[in-house]
Swiss-Prot record:
The modification N6-succinyllysine is found at residues 158, 171. Pathway: Steroid biosynthesis; estrogen biosynthesis; Lipid metabolism; fatty acid biosynthesis; Lipid metabolism; mitochondrial fatty acid beta-oxidation. Keywords: Acetylation, Fatty acid biosynthesis, Fatty acid metabolism, Lipid biosynthesis, Lipid metabolism, Mitochondrion, NAD, Oxidoreductase, Phosphoprotein, Steroid biosynthesis. The modification Phosphoserine is found at residue 58. It comes from Rattus norvegicus (Rat). This is (3R)-3-hydroxyacyl-CoA dehydrogenase. It catalyses: a (3R)-3-hydroxyacyl-CoA + NAD(+) = a 3-oxoacyl-CoA + NADH + H(+); 17beta-estradiol + NAD(+) = estrone + NADH + H(+); testosterone + NAD(+) = androst-4-ene-3,17-dione + NADH + H(+); 17beta-hydroxy-5alpha-androstan-3-one + NAD(+) = 5alpha-androstan-3,17-dione + NADH + H(+). One of its GO terms (biological process) is fatty acid biosynthetic process. Its EC number is 1.1.1.n12, 1.1.1.62, 1.1.1.239. It is found in: Mitochondrion matrix. The modification N6-acetyllysine is found at residue 66.
Amino acid sequence: MASQLRLRSALALVTGAGSGIGRAISVRLAAEGAAVAACDLDGAAAQDTVRLLGNPGSEDREPRGKHAAFQADVSEGPAAKRLLEQVQACFFRPPSVVVSCAGITRDEFLLHMSEEDWDRVIAVNLKGTFLVTQAAAQALVSSGGRGSIINISSIVGKVGNIGQTNYASSKAGVIGLTQTAARELGRHGIRCNSVLPGFIATPMTQKMPEKVKDKVTAMIPLGHMGDPEDVADVVAFLASEDSGYITGASVEVSGGLFM
């Protein structure tokens, strides 16, 4: 539970924090006691998220300046490095919890998908996750600190989905990236895990036609869409020492969809 304050001494960097799952993760980690560096391509949205966060180490819901918002396009190498530098300059330490949640979709059938739409989705979802993971790991190793890196993939990365060749490929890549990072970084005390959300109620899924939502919901054994908070619960667990012997895992949060 949040009242345990499992992350009282942690600094958490969350990308894609401006809405949906990223925002819910930021709120949950703050409720667990972490100081949160909320990053989004939309800097104003990141600021809005920070306003929702309570004071780290307390159950007070009023912001006390213990969190900070950042703007960055994580698909660009210099921007990702600069983000980590800015976070360290602001908090005087590297983040010990890093959650890569920044992601986009540009759906189209394989026969008609443009190279531009393929490249952009791969750049944000996969390359961006790589760049943030690399920069955060470098900062942690340099400081001698332990950490938990949590990359948000998707159940689609495991099973594929019609009209999402680019998205499915990017999220499958996130799983492979995270497992490899876990093998390489374990000796430094850095755990790396991925989370695979299923059909979650977010601004991204709200754009889907109702008949499509109904069709997918009917395939979920638990009978309903998930909430962003369902994903945030798992991320909080993986960020904490309650999962201290877990690394390289891919945790599905899907209500049983596609199991």
